[in-house]
């Protein structure tokens, strides 16, 4: 009532990311439902509800953890889905396992009891591990039976201590020139990539069954600095 000149047509909320249980939504749905009823009772009709807070996935075991059916039932329990427009923001849940980043082993270095596998994938290409220590499994693209029981860091070529894909106590016995697959990069991989360190954006390939097409061509060096050099 303090804002009589403002028309409230909808409510939006975001309660976090990687939510793996239904309980947080139960609490916020209850409060939001009460708020909608109060607003509708006092002055006007709420037309839409934007529900945000990313649904959780398990990167280590490659499974979707969130109880989606319970989530849908909960929405129906607290809100009139026939009259209220519901907008959902599932986040990484819909695309996280749709992407694989392929990188090449450039060099291998041994320093004391530590092994470093340097790849051509930098933190500019895939930011999640460097930005907030996001975990992604890495596997070789050719079958390798043995794993080495030595502390190993798989890193990128950028001169930053955070340019690291994974740390492992036991990693595959790969060699220079081998290709590695960084799994589950479909969410926030491409959108976070940049030209940091004057590195051109990598190409992206869309695969559907037995066909493929390039949806983003690899930048040339000239294209990567175009905004800084054009007159």
Region spans (language model):
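Active-site loop/helix belt of alpha/beta enzymes
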Residues: 1-108, 199
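Charged (often Lys/Glu-rich) extended helix/loop segments that serve as interaction or gating elements
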Residues: 74, 83-231
């Amino acid at each position: 009532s303090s804002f009589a000149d403002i028309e409230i047509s909808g409510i939006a909320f975001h309660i976090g990311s990687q939510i793996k249980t239904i309980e947080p939504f139960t609490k916020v749905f209850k409060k939001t439902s009460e708020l909608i009823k109060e607003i509708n009772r006092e002055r006007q009709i709420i037309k839409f509800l934007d529900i945000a807070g990313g649904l959780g996935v398990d990167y280590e075991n490659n499974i979707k953890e969130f109880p989606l059916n319970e989530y849908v039932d909960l929405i129906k329990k607290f809100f009139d889905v026939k009259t209220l427009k519901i907008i959902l923001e599932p986040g990484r849940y819909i695309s996280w396992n749709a992407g694989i980043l392929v990188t090449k082993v450039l060099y291998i270095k041994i320093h004391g009891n530590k092994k470093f596998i340097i790849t051509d994938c930098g933190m500019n290409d895939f930011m999640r591990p460097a930005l907030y220590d996001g975990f992604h499994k890495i596997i070789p693209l050719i079958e390798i039976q043995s794993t080495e029981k030595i502390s190993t860091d798989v890193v990128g070529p950028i001169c930053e201590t955070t340019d690291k894909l994974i740390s492992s106590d036991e990693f595959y016995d790969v060699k220079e020139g081998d290709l590695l697959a960084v799994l589950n990069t479909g969410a926030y991989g491409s959108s976070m990539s940049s030209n940091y360190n004057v590195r051109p954006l990598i190409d992206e390939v869309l695969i559907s069954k037995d066909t493929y097409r390039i949806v983003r061509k690899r930048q040339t060096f000239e294209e990567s600095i175009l905004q800084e050099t054009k007159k």
